[in-house]
């Protein structure tokens, strides 16, 4: 282990000088461990990551925790390898920080646990799986209109309080229950309170045992927020490559990854690019996203919450992310206000998998007809608001009649919300979803009341609900 000394501290950026011309490699982890000698000093156990080489013997590094108490001249040890984090079964049900240290007060990780470096190349071309396979989620609106691809990347857009977290939890639950799959949750620049709430909600709903969680909260230095997504990804890669699993990787929020990179870039002295972002924005995003893929062994499907600054979709941060996405799930506040959960906008959500050669001709035609019906209903809403239903043609009245039933049938109860609603959740296979909507479009259930379609699973449940309401079926 080669030793060096701190020669400069600039917030989260630390310069270290090594003797005898030794220069640690880029991305190497350096350790500073210092015991307080008097009451004016603090105990320090800090990890730095090498970012730049300055001359023959000096490196500029990014701190993974606060640099409070660092003094010039402190000893630094080169570990000779990048930051490495625990992987495998030991991570399930646990909460970690960027360095792979447990932060859930549930005890230490076994010393003999396998650890993998967080910086790794993306899978080679010949290792990639080429066939497109749909990931069934059991959530009707997603499976019908914006299906997820195994090994794909999904963007989840939504403001506060429209149900992003509940949708994420339900996806984790369904993948664990129906597919026996593993989930990894990476909280990037998260509010600590939200991360804490999510952890306890997952404990209560019983999905924590199939989940590993990694957090780099808002209050942490930019180095931690920039690398925590890679920590989560490394844990997910182990389950894909070594165990052949289909893994779900949640990143909340991918914008904070870019934001942290921008802060670090400025501190490293790089010339800023458009809108003040780092010049390496596309490269950093590509290095992360290219590792999220399907291989012949297994897949990592990622669902990324995306914050759009000032609702400007042309901002370089969201615009760079969009180019990597296979599907988008847009949550709409108006639908949440109507009590339609999940509040997924059926017209704004998209997926490249919604094509006849991938989902099949019947599924494709039903999905497109559902969207056409809802789009026509949307166009008619202004007329209805001003003149009322009576002024519509018979054809348009039928469109509205069916569109409202479709809109309500796109809602369903979630397993993870059962403790709040008192209603059991439903998992609906894709075939059942397509059949249900096809029959509604054919007018088979025009005689049933709208409320019978609200928050149910399969189409048979609509009939049962209508019977319970005293309607002749």
From Swiss-Prot:
Keywords: ATP synthesis, ATP-binding, Cell membrane, CF(1), Hydrogen ion transport, Ion transport, Membrane, Nucleotide-binding, Translocase, Transport
Annotated PANTHER family: ATP SYNTHASE (PTHR15184), ATP SYNTHASE SUBUNIT BETA, MITOCHONDRIAL (PTHR15184:SF71)
One CC-aspect GO term: proton-transporting ATP synthase complex
Enzyme Commission no: 7.1.2.2
Assembly information from the UniProt record: F-type ATPases have 2 components, CF(1) - the catalytic core - and CF(0) - the membrane proton channel. CF(1) has five subunits: alpha(3), beta(3), gamma(1), delta(1), epsilon(1). CF(0) has three main subunits: a(1), b(2) and c(9-12). The alpha and beta chains form an alternating ring which encloses part of the gamma chain. CF(1) is attached to CF(0) by a central stalk formed by the gamma and epsilon chains, while a peripheral stalk is formed by the delta and b chains.
Catalytic activities: ATP + H2O + 4 H(+)(in) = ADP + phosphate + 5 H(+)(out)
Name of the protein this chain belongs to: ATP synthase subunit beta
Compartment list: Cell membrane
Record-listed ATP binding positions: 158-165
Membrane topology: Peripheral membrane protein
Family designation: Belongs to the ATPase alpha/beta chains family.
A GO molecular-function annotation: ATP binding
Species for this entry: Geobacillus kaustophilus (strain HTA426)
Reported function: Produces ATP from ADP in the presence of a proton gradient across the membrane. The catalytic sites are hosted primarily by the beta subunits.
InterPro entries (alphabetical): AAA+_ATPase, ATP-synt_VA_C, ATP_synth_F1_bsu, ATPase_a/bsu_AS, ATPase_alpha/beta_chains, ATPase_F1/V1/A1_a/bsu_N, ATPase_F1/V1/A1_a/bsu_N_sf, ATPase_F1/V1/A1_a/bsu_nucl-bd
